[in-house]
Amino acid sequence: MSPVRPPREFEDFLRRTGLVESVEVPLFTPLEGGVSSDIWKVDVADRAICVKRALAKLKVEGDWHAPVERNAFEVAWMQKAASIAPGSAPEILAHDPASGMFAMTYLDPADCKLWKSELRAGRAGPDFASRCGHVLGTIHRETAGDAEVAARFATDQIFHAIRLEPYLEATAACHADVAGRLHELSAITAANRIVLVHGDVSPKNILITADGPVFLDAE
């Protein structure tokens, strides 16, 4: 059986950024990336890395499109979060805004667990949840009212396209009896610009490691 290969752009990105030498033949393994991205584990030389590309059209039944520029803000969130709470996000190894791709450290399942899987298996406790809250609270506290952060993450259109329109406003379109309240909630959320938020804090996006939580897939 032939090995699974990603689109050519992935290998081009790796070589262009120097993560793969010209003579290397990287081994690609597809990873589960939800509906909004293509994600691959790449074995190169003596390490494994992860490469992610945002999709313009999401992998859902409906015709859901989202700006691929969101990829650059995910990178920026990870870098900012890690500068405030070291270890709270994967390390960014390379980023190409034009292609909507970035590379980050690969977190081996042998060394960490997905919080969602642990909860599904009935393994839940307050300690890890408390650590998650502490890290997020620290990020919120350190970015609250920061004009520079607000300017750097002025992503109103992207946030509307991927967080508000497909959820609150799409639900409003199907339920006229609560449409007014949902549109009001959407407007209130869009106008709330106090701290830097992750955008999709969920157990499916949080890894349990020996050093604490690692947050993935910032929106």
Regions found by a protein language model. Name each.
Residues 1-28:
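Juxta-kinase regulatory segment immediately upstream of eukaryotic protein kinase catalytic domains
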Residues 1-7, 105, 138-188:
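Active-site catalytic-loop/activation-segment of kinase and kinase-like phosphoryl-transfer enzymes
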Residues 11, 76-79, 181-182:
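Short, well-ordered amphipathic alpha-helices
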Residues 19-26, 74, 162, 180-191:
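Short Pro/Gly-enriched beta-strand edge/turn motifs at strand-loop
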Residues 21-24, 47, 88, 211:
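Residue-level signal for beta-strand positions within conserved beta-sheet cores that form or flank
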Residues 22, 83-86, 190, 209:
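Short, structurally constrained coil/turn elements
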Residues 29-45, 49-51, 184-219:
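Active-site acidic catalytic loop and adjacent metal/ATP-binding pocket
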Residues 31, 36, 40-147:
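ATP-binding pocket architecture of kinase catalytic cores
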